[in-house]
Structures are given as structure tokens and as C-alpha cells.
UniProtKB/Swiss-Prot annotation:
Keywords: Amino-acid biosynthesis, Arginine biosynthesis, ATP-binding, Cytoplasm, Ligase, Nucleotide-binding. It catalyses: L-citrulline + L-aspartate + ATP = 2-(N(omega)-L-arginino)succinate + AMP + diphosphate + H(+). Belongs to the argininosuccinate synthase family. Type 2 subfamily. This is Argininosuccinate synthase. Pathway: Amino-acid biosynthesis; L-arginine biosynthesis; L-arginine from L-ornithine and carbamoyl phosphate: step 2/3. InterPro entries: Arg_succ_synth_type2_subfam, Arginosuc_syn_C, Arginosuc_syn_N, Arginosuc_synth, Arginosuc_synth_CS, Arginosuc_synth_type_1_subfam, AS_cat/multimer_dom_body, AS_multimer_C_tail. It comes from Salmonella dublin (strain CT_02021853). Its EC number is 6.3.4.5. GO terms for biological process: argininosuccinate metabolic process; L-arginine biosynthetic process; urea cycle. One of its GO terms (molecular function) is ATP binding. It is found in: Cytoplasm.
Length: 447
């Protein structure tokens, strides 16, 4: 069976991930006119820039959908977001600022839940708005086929007939008007935005040029913290975790994770927390640039890692970071539910996250400027008295440390012999200044 259909399968049911925007509206109407039977599926991901979710399926029916469904994905999305925080599943960082993989998390949820809904309706052909140059076309492909082994893919944006007729937004708008729908194009922004309740992605157009900065972006989850005219008073916030799960903000306990994430977004968003500018490697190995918002994810991540460093030992923390980066890349690649990802998730959640219980108090200021004010946990292995510089009882004595240092003589002697061995092999040069062979100064090389 052919998995990817290059031309419209007339007479057959086609499920389309319908956002209600110009692209998917024109595509749905065009497919109906060309003889297909379109079914529209809209994911409610708690997008901060969407005001009326219930209106989206109604518009789909007006444009010719045989049926239209709104699928509430928020609970599952937040569950996956919390799992990512527990595992540190983030691999893209620049200057200490993290991209929280909010788009890959959204695709993992959308790609599985929408295709599952289609399968319930007997719809085994799926189309979405992802382009052939991006990451999402592969993410949706993988998640769709994982959910429904019989799935076929039809994307109007890969169909030359569709492209020839409606290849641009102007043509799509004219097509909608000609068909009796007063569809006006929204005002073109200097960049494209995609969002869910975990975060927002701003990319493309002017942001493809590296001399266009974050200052051209209008945040949809936060504030312009770089604009000194925007007043942002400092604010204290306390985050509580129980066994790796965020349960309370500022003393308020949440039984609903969705409400908890919305409140975390509001708190972090008031300061522009979690906004970053990243150059990343797409799945196809080409570099792209995005500006990201994730105020709630950032707030929870900061508090979680503060507890992590106070509770776990050095090797466990190192494994958390190493495995987390691996898992973050798998998530980015659309492999969040692959066996290698599940193996990493299980270990990190079972042995690391389960011990993260306690409270962290922060002072948030502008952007990613914050201070940690207090850290409290019954599980802390940080004990101030162990290494106090003040006189008093200690768990070990000066003689104990002398013995420990004496044992180091073994590997120090081995290292010294190795250095002179490298010098004999010509890999290092002798140094009269230190008495040890050294790497030759590159400034002197060739003189």
C-alpha cells in the first residue's frame, strides 16, 4: 500500500487537521469541490492566541466538512510537558537559555490524538498543514502511522494540482471570496507564530535574518521585558513538587494540572520568563532560527532543577543531564514514544523524579533574570554543617583528609609519567618554566 498520496483521492474520506486559518480553510473547501469527503479535526491545545475554539468546527462545516470535531488535548499535553521537565528532555540551549521543546511536545500529542479520533470515524487518510522543508511533516508522519498502521497521508501542499491553483495566500483568499465566503487575510506579520499552552514559537520571514532580533516580536505569553518603558515589578513565587510532580504555586494546591500550567504561565509571563533565541538543527540537518516563549515550563524547570541539585548525587545529576539531552533530541525528532525514548523516560522518572519533593522560592524580575531565595526539602542531601567553615564538630577530621590526599599520590604519579611519555613521543614539548611537558604554544608554531 502506498503511504503517501501525491494527488487527491476523490470519493474517499480525508481527515484534515483544521486550524480555521486561511490555509486549512482553503484546502478543505478545495478538497470538497474536487470530490473528496473531508473530515475536520481541531486540537484544543490551549493555544494562547485562540479565543473561540467552538467556532472552529462550525467554520469547517460551512466550508464543506462532512463532519468536524474538536478534540481536547490539553490534559495529555500538560502530562507530556511535566514528563519532559522530570526528565530534563531539552537539548537545545544557547548561552544557558533553554528551548523547552514545546512544539515537539505539541506534535506528539496532536499526531496521536487526532489520528486516534479519525480512526474512530473510519477515516484512514490524513492531511495537515506542515511543509516539506520543516520538522513537522516527519513528526506527524511518524506519530500518525504509530497510531494507525493503515493510515495514508495526503497533504494538499504536496499536491501539484493544489499548488498550481492555490499556491499562495493571495490565491487562497481570492478562492474563498469567489466561493462566497468573505474571508479576508489577516494582517501579515513579520514572522510566523505557532503555539500551544506549553509555549509559543516565532519563526520565518524576517526572523530568518539574524540581524532581526527578539525586539520585533510581540510576545503572546509574556511581555516585552527588553522595553524599559514596560513596568515589571519584582515578584516572589514559591513552587512545590511532590515526587517530581508540580502540585502547588504560592501555597495554592492544584488538583488539575491544566489549571496549574495556566497559572504558571501567568506568573512567568508577567516577567517574560522563558523567552529565548535559538539556532537549531532541523531533522534534515539544515539550521533554522526560532524565538521561543515558555513561561510556565521555565518556572517549573528552574524549581525542579534546584531541588534536583540539592537531593541527588553528582553522578546521578550527570546522568540526568546526559540522558535528558538524548531524550530531548528523540523528542525533537518525533520519537517520543519510541522504545529508546521510553527506556530513558522510565529511568529518569523512576529514579530521579520520584525523589524530587520540596519547595523552591524565587524572585522573578525581568526576562530570565531571577534569584533563588529559599530551597526546602526533607530529601535534601545538602547539609550545611558537613562543610561549614566555622569551628565545630565535623563528620571527618584533618587527619582523614590527609589520608585521602595521600591516596591521590598514586594517580598523580601515573599522570606525571604519562606526560613525560607523551614528550618522548613528540606530542608535548619540554617546559623549563613548569618542569612539566606542555602542549606547544600555537602562537609560536611555525616561527
Amino acid at each position: 500500500m502506498t503511504t503517501i498520496l501525491k494527488h487527491l483521492p476523490a470519493g474517499q474520506r480525508i481527515g484534515i487537521a483544521f486550524s480555521g486559518g486561511l490555509d486549512t480553510s482553503a484546502a478543505l473547501l478545495w478538497m470538497r469541490q474536487k470530490g473528496a469527503v473531508p473530515y475536520a479535526y481541531t486540537a484544543n491545545l490551549g493555544q494562547p492566541d485562540e479565543d473561540d475554539y467552538d467556532a472552529i468546527p462550525r467554520r469547517a462545516m460551512e466550508y464543506g466538512a462532512e463532519n468536524a470535531r474538536l478534540i481536547d488535548c490539553r490534559k495529555q499535553l500538560v502530562a507530556e510537558g511535566i514528563a519532559a521537565i522530570q526528565c530534563g528532555a531539552f537539548h537545545n540551549t544557547t548561552g544557558g537559555l533553554t528551548y523547552f521543546n514545546t512544539t515537539p511536545l505539541g506534535r506528539a500529542v496532536t499526531g496521536t490524538m487526532l489520528v486516534a479520533a479519525m480512526k474512530e470515524d473510519g477515516v484512514n487518510i490524513w492531511g495537515d498543514g506542515s511543509t516539506y522543508k520543516g520538522n513537522d511533516i516527519e513528526r506527524f508522519y511518524r506519530y500518525g502511522l504509530l497510531t494507525n498502521a493503515e493510515l495514508q497521508i495526503y497533504k494538499p501542499w504536496l499536491d501539484t494540482d493544489f499548488i498550481d491553483e492555490l499556491g499562495g495566500r493571495h490565491e487562497m483568499s481570492e478562492f474563498m471570496i469567489a466561493c462566497g465566503f468573505d474571508y479576508k487575510m489577516s494582517v501579515e506579520k513579520a514572522y510566523s507564530t505557532d503555539s500551544n499552552m506549553l509555549g509559543a514559537t516565532h519563526e520565518a520571514k524576517d526572523l530568518e535574518f539574524l540581524n532581526s532580533s527578539v525586539k520585533i516580536v510581540n510576545p503572546i505569553m509574556g511581555v516585552k521585558f527588553w522595553d524599559e518603558s514596560v513596568k515589571i515589578p519584582a515578584e516572589e513565587v514559591t513552587v512545590r513538587f511532590e515526587q517530581g510532580h508540580p502540585v502547588a504555586l504560592n501555597g495554592k494546591t492544584f488538583s488539575d494540572d491544566v489549571e496549574m500550567m495556566l497559572e504558571a504561565n501567568r506568573i512567568g509571563g508577567r516577567h517574560g520568563l522563558g523567552m529565548s533565541d535559538q539556532i537549531e538543527n532541523r531533522i534534515i540537518e539544515a539550521k533554522s532560527r526560532g524565538i521561543y516563549e515558555a513561561p510556565g515550563m521555565a518556572l517549573l524547570h528552574i524549581a525542579y532543577e534546584r531541588l534536583l541539585t540539592g537531593i541527588h548525587n553528582e553522578d546521578t545529576i550527570e546522568q540526568y543531564h546526559s540522558h535528558g539531552r538524548q531524550l530531548g533530541k528523540l523528542l525533537y525528532l518525533g520519537r517520543w514514544f519510541d522504545s529508546q525514548a521510553l527506556m530513558l523516560r522510565d529511568g529518569l522518572q523512576r529514579w530521579v523524579a520520584s525523589q524530587i519533593t520540596g519547595e523552591v522560592t524565587l524572585e522573578l524580575r525581568r526576562g530570565n533574570d531571577y534569584s533563588i531565595l529559599n530551597t526546602v526539602s526533607d530529601n535534601l542531601t545538602y547539609k550545611a554543617e558537613r562543610l561549614t567553615m566555622e569551628k565545630g564538630e565535623s563528620v571527618f577530621s584533618p587527619d582523614d583528609r590527609i589520608g585521602q590526599l595521600t591516596m591521590r599520590n598514586l594517580d598523580i604519579t601515573d599522570t606525571r609519567e604519562k606526560l613525560f611519555g607523551y614528550a618522548k613521543a613528540g606530542l608535548l614539548t619540554a617546559s623549563s618554566a613548569t618542569g612539566l611537558p606542555q602542549v606547544e604554544n600555537l602562537e609560536n608554531k611555525g616561527k
